[in-house]
Amino acid sequence: MSLIFADEAWEDYLYWQKQDKHMIERINKLIREVQREPFTGIGKPEALKHSLSGFWSRRITDEHRMVYRVEGDAVLIAQWRFHY
């Protein structure tokens, strides 16, 4: 699956690259996992509801979540920092 980053998600990704190598390693691991298995696996995948229906989240840490949506054979990453 290919990756598409929303503007905010790309800014978040660059932030983690500069701020925390451990965090970026975890994020890269989640990217690989989502590309293989978008709805199962590590990070406790959870389908979101209400205004975020169609999006999924995975835990990066207790504070931060990966929020994404599968569109055909692409994954749109919406955000990496904080809760949705």
Regions found by a protein language model. Name each.
Residues S2, E8-E25, I42, L48-K49, ...:
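Enriched for short, Lys/Arg-rich terminal
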Residues I24-E37:
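Compact soluble domain cores
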Residues I31-R32, T40, K44, L52:
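Short, functionally important structural connectors and interaction interfaces within domains
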